[in-house]
Amino acid sequence: MGMEDMADTDQARMGGERRRLDALVIGAGFGGMYALHRARGMGLDVLAIEAGDDVGGTWYWNRYPGARCDVMSIDYSYSFSDEIQQEWTWSEQFAAQPEIFAYARFVADTLDLKRDIHFGTRATAIEYDDDACLWRITTDRGDLFEATYCLMATGPLSVPKQVDIPGADRFGGELYLSGKWPHHPVAFAGKRVAVIGTGSSGIQIVPVVAEQAAHLHVFQRTPSFTLPMRNRPLDPDFVGHIKRHYPGLRAVARHSLTGGVRPISSRPLFSVSPEERERLMEEAWQHSGLAFLGLFSDLLTNAEANEVVADFVRGKIAEVVDDPDTARRLTPRGYPIFARRPCLDTQYYESFNRENVTLMDCLEDPIVEITEHGIRTREREVQVDMIIAAIGYDALTGAMLSIDIKGKGGRSLKQKWADGGRSYLGLVMEGFPNLFIIAGPNGPSALANFILLNEQNVDWICDCIEHMRANGLRAVQALPDAEDRWMRKVTELGGRSLYPTANTWYTGANVPGKPRVFPVYIGGLGRYREICSDAAAQGYEGLEFE
């Protein structure tokens, strides 16, 4: 492109671009990046738009102290390119945010993706033209794109909940959201800091801030089960072994339950003696909490088996935390272990043995308001210089519902999803032709390795588009009865497990007014792949083409 052409493009962007495309990808996280790469490889005229100023999705936004992936780095990476697998070398078993973000940028540079991404651009409305069989997408920069296919790579954890505590706007100190952490350094030294929330983000933030702050107050409503991460540098010989055997390891991972290479046992908990159970759990605790998920086959279907493991972890909390009352308050009860996304921590419980850390139990003494100088509970006011809100996300459906999406006949997505997210295979919806979802609700989403799931979703979607183009088909949507059958399957499978019994972001219980449903397919990534492949092999069974 010459300078004159670039100037014309810049001018168009300033006034809002008008462009007709084959495909528009919304989001440039790991799902959107791969979707852009695949679509370009098919010869489509494709563009991606991204609200952030760089690639990486959740790893662009989540820069909070201690941010780290709880999936092993050798698994949490693309498998479609052996060149990328061989050139990139992970430094730790569980990679931190800066390294994952650097990896995303490395992939984007290797594949030259950024030339087809508009950064700093957020979709505000997406409307289907029934007659023209295309989508019209408007953005917050005044752009208007028309696309035959719209690929939603908005991510399941990309809309942080906002602080809705009265008085937040009058706080005189620093206030940060973990999910929208600033890009400039934040200093904790010498400051009184409050962390609100003890889910995955809060559990990672607390140990880092505790080491630096003058005093840290941790405001906890519901205690979380968290297991030791036991992170460590990756040995070069081990990395070399993995790289040599990546093809076989990836094949196993793609057809596994979660998309990883760790072993999953087929033995029920009560099939082994109490002594053997104790030995296995102690080994898992000392090696890495991640190993707990594969110890026994019935931890999420048998409440009694689940309680055995939960009691073991409760005992560990009592061992680690010196003060018995603090240990009691940190101990989760009333919901099954692993029914909420399991957390892996680095010295989380140990942080509460520090003299500069105070646990605030919001069940016993709830937060009433934020004041100019701190946080007022029912019984006291805690004065702080900084508040960090680690209060979670409007997960799975929040990102798509934040856009004004209207399908056939002007029907809105908000109407369709009024009772919770629904789709066919988590990929296609009735009433929204040529709108494809990547890692959204109704697939394995939160229970699988997101990157391998993204690859599978994108491959299936792009294969479907190729099928349409080869056969002169203009539009595709899910058949109503196929969507109904899939949702029944998702609901019935979930109902056989312990997942729906806990108040979690899986079910939407963390967002006031959100429908309480469990929309995630729990049959595993491998079985999900088979179902999707079978549907494609049957001429895309469950879909209606025109």
Placement of each model-derived feature along the sequence:
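N-terminal FAD-binding dinucleotide-binding subdomain shared by FAD-dependent oxidases/monooxygenases
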Residues: 2-23, 28, 33-168, 173, ...
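A conserved hydrophobic secondary-structure block that centers on an alpha-helix together
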Residues: 182-188, 193-196
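Ligand/cofactor pocket segment of small-molecule handling proteins
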Residues: 206
